[in-house]
């Protein structure tokens, strides 16, 4: 049994080591050979049955002709002798056991048990094959018995020739099938060969050029899918290279400044070095802490962007009002000199809680950064339609020029006025990435068009559904109730101005988006 299993595994290894072209060709040959064998067998059986049936018909016709002519009764010897000039053997046995025979040269009509039973009258008729002859025995009404036989050698010769013809034709058919299968396989697998060469080229040279697509069959679709994979790989490498380049550039500046300040601090602490004034020492320490915080923020933003690019989004039901509340608590700790006016509704979204929290926090941070001390930031979350919620974060800062509204969502982009302020240039890029991953839309408008400063309002449209009443009440009870929630986030106010419309607003700047399935 072990030896049999080993042989089976060896056979499987040998089969799997064959190329796809050889396997397809062998499969075609096997199928054609099977069809040829079945067809040859069917032809042989049909022709053989027809020939032997024809011999039986001939014997019966001869017997009926002799019986109908009456010559067997008038002159049986002459009647039987006349059959010698044909291709049959004949024998007549009378009741008195007189026997008349006429045989072909070299042949003798065999008489066996079946024929003897007919002669004795036990059987009316019998047919059988014996000694390469087909024998017919008939018991006549006058108690005579007529036996006629015919040699099967001519028929067997025909069948032998037929076997050879079928063998030769079948072999030629299998050979032609092998050649045709090889040609068809080569032509059919040519696109697969191109795909293989392209994959090897990518692995060897990092060449991501697409493969030409011919036709519209399954292999063409496979080629198109491979080209899509190549394009996605090229875009991923481009994004990775751009991210590494931009990150290196953005990290170099704070690291250089941090190194300079640290070296200055170390030098000032040397035994014989002149001591810096206390105010300068405090400023240096504050600068070092600020630069460390800037580096931490930049690294965190890079990690968030990398995670969003990889598509590692965990979908779970999220209460957006809870996300809004937690983000507001964090941004208030950073900018307690800004007054936040918030109006929120219960809204449930299926998505990434961490990503949405990061996006909302970045929107509020951005609005607070551009607001003067004592300024006001308005945050409104309202139902836009039965399946979408609109989040609006508005400030009354200097605003964003129309020509820069697309650029502010690009990675590391910072306008001329923003370069003097702290930040990595990644905050709004993270917002855009999170909104896209959740199937949302983004647009930018002036908060107060025609007024100086115009301010900035960023509109976010996200899919979802109203928060179920029972679940929302539970969350409210869990977080000290709706009244305490309003006390935490400040009084709820209605944002001034007419309601924004994502489709008909005059100052809409579309940002790249992609649709996503709302869960």
From Swiss-Prot:
It catalyses: ATP + protein L-histidine = ADP + protein N-phospho-L-histidine. InterPro entries: 2C_sensor_his_kinase (IPR050980), HAMP_dom (IPR003660), HATPase_C_sf (IPR036890), His_kinase_dom (IPR005467), HisK_dim/P_dom (IPR003661), HisK_dim/P_sf (IPR036097), Sig_transdc_His_kin-like_C (IPR004358). It is found in: Cell membrane. PROSITE patterns: HAMP, HIS_KIN. Residues 186-238 form the HAMP domain. Autophosphorylated. Pfam families: HAMP (PF00672), HATPase_c (PF02518), HisKA (PF00512). Its cofactor is Mg(2+); Mn(2+). One of its GO terms (molecular function) is phosphoprotein phosphatase activity. One of its GO terms (cellular component) is plasma membrane. Its EC number is 2.7.13.3, 3.1.3.-. Residues 1-26, 185-519 are cytoplasmic. Residues 48-163 are extracellular. The modification Phosphohistidine is found at residue 249. Residues 246-466 form the Histidine kinase domain. It is a multi-pass membrane protein. Signal peptide: none annotated. Keywords: ATP-binding, Cell membrane, Hydrolase, Kinase, Magnesium, Manganese, Membrane, Nucleotide-binding, Phosphoprotein, Protein phosphatase, Stress response, Transferase, Transmembrane, Transmembrane helix, Two-component regulatory system, Virulence. The chain crosses the membrane at residues 27-47, 164-184. PANTHER family: SENSOR PROTEIN CREC (PTHR44936:SF9). Member of the two-component regulatory system MprB/MprA which contributes to maintaining a balance among several systems involved in stress resistance and is required for establishment and maintenance of persistent infection in the host. In response to environmental signals MprB acts both as a membrane-associated protein kinase that undergoes autophosphorylation and subsequently transfers the phosphate to MprA, and a protein phosphatase that dephosphorylates phospho-MprA. This is Signal transduction histidine-protein kinase/phosphatase MprB. The gene is mprB.
């Amino acid at each position: 049994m072990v030896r049999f299993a080993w042989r089976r595994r060896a056979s499987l290894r040998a089969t799997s080591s064959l190329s796809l072209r050889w396997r397809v060709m062998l499969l075609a040959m096997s199928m054609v050979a099977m069809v040829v064998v079945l067809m040859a067998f069917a032809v042989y059986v049909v022709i053989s049955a027809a020939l032997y049936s024809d011999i039986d018909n001939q014997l019966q016709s001869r017997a009926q002709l002799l019986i109908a002519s009456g010559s067997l009764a008038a002159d049986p010897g002459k009647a039987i002798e006349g059959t010698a000039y044909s291709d049959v053997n004949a024998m007549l046995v009378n009741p008195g056991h007189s026997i008349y025979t006429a045989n072909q040269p070299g042949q003798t009509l065999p008489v066996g048990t079946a024929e003897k039973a007919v002669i004795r009258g036990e059987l009316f008729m019998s047919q059988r094959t014996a000694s390469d002859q087909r024998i017919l025995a008939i018991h006549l009404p006058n108690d005579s018995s007529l036996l006629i036989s015919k040699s099967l050698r001519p028929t067997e010769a025909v069948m032998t020739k037929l076997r050879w013809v079928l063998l030769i034709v079948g072999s030629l058919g299998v050979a032609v099938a092998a050649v045709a299968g090889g040609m068809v396989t080569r032509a059919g697998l040519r696109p697969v060969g191109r795909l293989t060469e392209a994959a090897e080229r990518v692995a060897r040279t990092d060449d991501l050029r697409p493969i030409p697509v011919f036709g519209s069959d399954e292999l063409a679709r496979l080629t198109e899918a491979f080209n899509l994979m190549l394009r996605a790989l090229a875009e991923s490498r481009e994004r990775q290279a751009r991210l590494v380049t931009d990150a290196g550039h953005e990290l170099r500046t704070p690291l250089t400044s941090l190194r300079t300040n640290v070296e200055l601090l170390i030098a000032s602490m040397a035994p014989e070095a002149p001591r810096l004034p206390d105010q300068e020492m405090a400023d240096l320490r504050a600068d070092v802490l600020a630069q460390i915080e800037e580096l931490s923020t930049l690294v965190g933003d890079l990690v968030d962007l990398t995670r969003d690019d990889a598509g590692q989004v965990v979908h779970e039901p999220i209460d957006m009002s809870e996300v809004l509340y937690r983000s507001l608590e964090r941004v208030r700790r950073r900018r307690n000199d800004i007054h936040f006016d918030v109006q929120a509704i219960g809204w449930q979204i299926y998505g990434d809680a961490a990503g949405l929290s990061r996006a909302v926090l970045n929107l509020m941070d951005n609005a607070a950064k551009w607001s003067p001390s004592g300024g006001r930031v308005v945050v409104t979350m309202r139902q836009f339609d039965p399946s979408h919620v609109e989040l609006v974060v508005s400030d009354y800062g200097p605003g964003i020029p129309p020509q820069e509204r697309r650029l502010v969502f690009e990675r590391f982009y910072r306008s001329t006025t923003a370069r003097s302020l702290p930040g990595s240039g990644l905050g709004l890029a993270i917002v855009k990435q999170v909104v896209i991953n959740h199937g949302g839309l983004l647009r930018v408008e002036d908060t107060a068009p025609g007024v100086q400063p115009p301010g900035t309002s960023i509109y976010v449209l996200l899919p979802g559904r109203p928060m179920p009443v029972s679940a929302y009440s539970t969350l409210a009870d869990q977080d000290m109730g709706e009244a305490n929630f309003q006390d935490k986030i400040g009084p709820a106010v209605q944002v001034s101005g007419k309601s924004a419309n994502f489709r008909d607003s005059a100052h809409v700047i579309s940002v790249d988006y992609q649709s996503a399935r709302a869960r």
